[in-house]
UniProtKB/Swiss-Prot annotation:
HAMAP family: HscB (MF_00682). This is Co-chaperone protein HscB homolog. It comes from the Bacteria. Residues 2-74 form the J domain. InterPro entries: DnaJ_domain (IPR001623), HscB (IPR004640), HscB_C_sf (IPR036386), HscB_oligo_C (IPR009073), J_dom_sf (IPR036869). One of its GO terms (cellular component) is iron-sulfur cluster transfer complex. Interacts with HscA and stimulates its ATPase activity. Signal peptide: none annotated.
Length: 172
């Protein structure tokens, strides 16, 4: 399934979200079950399946990590294996450990001001990586794009941990 084809969009990391939303609504309207009440059971099933594909494609195109993986797969034919592709960048591995330790300390100290600053730093890193990823994809540097995408996957998980700590601190 090529999510770009489903929405009739060019294969590009930068997706116009307004166009994507408009096309999503049009597709979902055309596939609405009410439009198939007089059709055969098979046609109804196919419409439901197509609707599910549209939903899956939307999720891929809205998530920059999944969108990048899809672009890489389209151009290289390679599917990314998350378990197999942990980053070998030692500096980034050390940074990951440092961030986790820093987050643990913030949680132990229950310091919401430090958490806000930490979160802002991580989000800034995420934005820089997204920019690097866009550049790598546009210049078709697939291996570099994979490495950056792995880093973004870690950042995404770390930001979820930050949210968990934030919720915990708010309960106090």
């Amino acid at each position: 399934m090529n999510p770009f084809n489903i929405f009739d969009l060019p294969v590009d990391f930068h997706v116009d979200q307004a166009t994507l939303s408009a096309r999503y609504l049009a597709l979902q309207k055309s596939l609405h079950p009410d439009n198939f009440t007089t059709h055969s059971a098979q046609e109804q099933r196919l419409a439901m399946q197509r609707s599910a594909e549209v939903n899956d494609a939307l999720q891929i195109l809205k998530d920059p990590i999944l969108r990048a993986e899809t672009i890489i797969a389209i151009y290289t034919g390679e599917q990314q294996n998350i378990e197999e592709n942990s980053t070998r960048d030692m500096a980034f591995l050390m940074q990951q450990m440092q961030w986790r330790e820093q987050l643990e300390n913030i949680e132990a100290q229950q310091d919401s001001d430090q958490l806000v600053a930490f979160s802002a730093d991580i989000e800034q890193t995420q934005q820089a990586l997204l920019s690097e990823l866009a550049d790598a994809l546009s210049s078709q540097q697939w291996q570099q794009a994979k490495v950056i995408n792995d880093k973004l996957r870690f950042i995404k998980k770390l930001l979820l941990e930050v949210e968990r700590v934030e919720e915990k601190l708010l309960d106090f």
